[in-house]
Amino acid sequence: MNTTHASMTVIGAGSYGTALAITLARNGHQVVLWGHDPKHIQTLQQDRCNQAFLPDVPFPDTLLLETDLARALAASRDVLVVVPSHVFGAVLNQLKPHLRPDARIVWATKGLEAETGRLLADVAREVLGESIPLAVVSGPTFAKELAAGLPTAIALASTDVQFSEDLQQLLHCGKSFRVYSNPDFIGVQLGGAVKNVIAIGAGMSDGIGFGANARTALITRGLAEMTRLGSALGADPSTFMGMAGLGDLVLTCTDNQSRNRRFGIMLGQGLGVQEAQDKIGQVVEGYRNTKEVLALAQRNGVEMPITEQIYQVLYSHKNAREAALTLLGRTKKDEKSGI
């Protein structure tokens, strides 16, 4: 296939990367999709669909598959990175030698840098330099629904006004995909990481059998933790009432399409961490995000008791029910304290 020119190159051929590539192509754009496994890309090309993740969604004719990274990146100045957060920096290093001089980078990855807990924008600047335009898209999106063309809305934030406008034009589809611009580059990044953690907690609560009251309380107090951390990092608190905050949080905490939620349910039912991960069979971003978010909160002096108890379950073998009782037994306080 001719990949000499495209509106967007998508890096990452998992469920979400494929869904975004399909959406862009369905919008009338020529899109190049690249993945790290050439055999997987060749299979996608042969099948013209992603049988592993989105078996019922055929690829539009304008979605092109590419096994050669240099050719994929030469095709477009705009590059959408959709990879797990723990390999984000490594993937950018892999892309760097092949990027066009006019390249612009946007990512749909939700999370923080592994171990350090840094925002992904800080990682991108370190790898690619300060001058390259950067952007992030985040919000309540399950890949299957997006790929099926069901109505979806997300938030978009960028360091560059023109890039933001161009991306909004590329992604927005009046029939099914609404893209809201947001000037809060920090907040839009952070919401997607913290919601993964809280979704594990919501799953634990349901796995234990605590019911709807407990789940809703946990979501609400989880939003408070997200807002406290965001404010400490310089984000606009109102961002967390939007798509990248409350929207993504509610979706991930309440629907079993969420791997983080299903993982938490299994833990609440008594399964071990490794056993639950094995049963999910795909990356559970919230597992690593919990450690990273807690480290970030502690460095900035932010209290996040729900996140701390989830960490205790994941990394210190604490029983999920005991963690819940620890939260319920905390000292009484004002609801708006710290927000």
From Swiss-Prot:
Subcellular location per UniProt equals: Cytoplasm
Major place of localization? cytoplasm
The domain of life is Bacteria
PANTHER family in the record? GLYCEROL-3-PHOSPHATE DEHYDROGENASE, GLYCEROL-3-PHOSPHATE DEHYDROGENASE [NAD(+)] 2, CHLOROPLASTIC
Which pathway does this chain act in? Membrane lipid metabolism; glycerophospholipid metabolism
Q: Which UniProt keywords apply?
A: Cytoplasm, Lipid biosynthesis, Lipid metabolism, NAD, NADP, Nucleotide-binding, Oxidoreductase, Phospholipid biosynthesis, Phospholipid metabolism
What does it catalyze? sn-glycerol 3-phosphate + NAD(+) = dihydroxyacetone phosphate + NADH + H(+); sn-glycerol 3-phosphate + NADP(+) = dihydroxyacetone phosphate + NADPH + H(+)
The EC number(s) this enzyme carries: 1.1.1.94
Any one Gene Ontology cellular component term annotated for this protein: cytosol
The record's annotation in NCBIfam families points to:
PRK00094.1-1, PRK00094.1-2, PRK00094.1-4
Give the protein name, as stated in the record: Glycerol-3-phosphate dehydrogenase [NAD(P)+]
> Would you kindly state one Gene Ontology biological process term found in this protein's UniProt entry?
glycerol-3-phosphate biosynthetic process
Pfam families the UniProt entry points to: NAD_Gly3P_dh_C, NAD_Gly3P_dh_N
Q: Between which residues do disulfide bridges form?
A: none
Provide the residue positions that the database annotates as binding NADPH.
S15, Y16, H36, K110, A143, R259, V283, E285
Q: Where is the active site?
A: K195 (proton acceptor)
UniProt function note:
Catalyzes the reduction of the glycolytic intermediate dihydroxyacetone phosphate (DHAP) to sn-glycerol 3-phosphate (G3P), the key precursor for phospholipid synthesis.
User: A single GO molecular function, which one?
Assistant: glycerol-3-phosphate dehydrogenase [NAD(P)+] activity
